[in-house]
Design a protein with these regions (language model features):
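Conserved non-catalytic scaffold segment of RNase H-like nuclease domains
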Residues: 2-7, 12-101
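Acidic, Mg2+-coordinating catalytic module of metal-dependent nucleases/exonucleases
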Residues: 95-104, 109-110, 140-168
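Acidic active-site catalytic centers that drive phospho-/nucleotidyl reactions
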Residues: 10-12, 107, 131, 154
Length: 168
C-alpha cells in the first residue's frame, strides 16, 4: 500500500443509518506519516433533513445524554449541507486518495450518502475506502478512551493510530 497520502474522516450524526443526518465532519490529512492538514465543519441538521437524510429519535436521545460540550460543539456556526460538502470536496481535492473511516459501514458510507442526496460527484474511488476499526481489530489495537464526540478530535486520534500502525 502506498502510504504517502491518506485521509481519515469522522462524522457526528443524528442517526446510525447509512443515510444519517450529518452534524459535523472532521478529517485529517496524513502525508509521509505525519498529520499535515485538518478539516472541520458543522452542518445544519435541518438542511440534511431537507435533503432526505435520516434523523433517529434514539440517537437524538443519546446526544441528550452526552456532555454539554459535546452537544454544543456541533451546534456552533453550522452551515447548510451543500456548503459543507462543497468545502469538504475542495479540501479533499479531485485526486482519489485513500480515505479511512472508523467502521466499514459508518463514516465514509454516510458521507457518500450525503453526496448522493445532493447529486454530487464523490471524489474518491470505492477501492480507496478503508476501515481503521477492522485493521485495529486484526492487530489487537485500541484507541485511547474518549467521550468527547468531536469529529475532528476523533479523526485526529484515528489518524495518529493509523500512523502508528503504518510505521510498525
Amino acid at each position: 500500500m502506498d502510504t504517502t497520502k491518506q485521509v481519515v474522516v469522522d462524522l457526528e450524526t443524528l442517526s446510525t443509518h447509512a443515510n444519517a443526518c450529518i452534524v459535523s465532519i472532521g478529517a485529517v490529512l496524513v502525508e509521509d506519516m505525519e498529520i499535515t492538514d485538518t478539516f472541520y465543519i458543522n452542518v445544519d441538521g435541518r438542511t440534511c433533513k431537507e435533503a432526505g437524510l435520516h434523523i433517529d429519535p434514539d440517537t437524538i436521545k443519546w446526544w441528550g445524554e452526552q456532555s454539554k460540550e459535546a452537544q454544543q460543539a456541533w451546534q456552533q456556526n453550522p452551515v447548510p449541507l451543500q456548503e459543507a460538502i462543497d468545502k469538504f470536496t475542495i479540501w479533499y481535492g479531485r485526486e482519489s486518495i485513500p480515505i479511512w473511516g472508523y467502521g466499514a459501514n459508518f463514516d465514509v458510507v454516510i458521507l457518500e450518502s450525503a453526496y448522493r442526496a445532493l447529486d454530487m460527484f464523490i471524489p474518491w474511488k470505492f477501492w480507496d475506502i478503508s476501515c481503521l476499526r477492522t485493521l485495529m481489530n486484526v492487530l489487537d489495537k485500541r484507541l485511547p478512551k474518549s467521550n468527547n464526540h468531536n469529529a475532528l478530535d476523533d479523526a485526529t486520534a484515528q489518524a495518529n493510530m493509523l500512523i502508528e500502525i503504518l510505521k510498525s
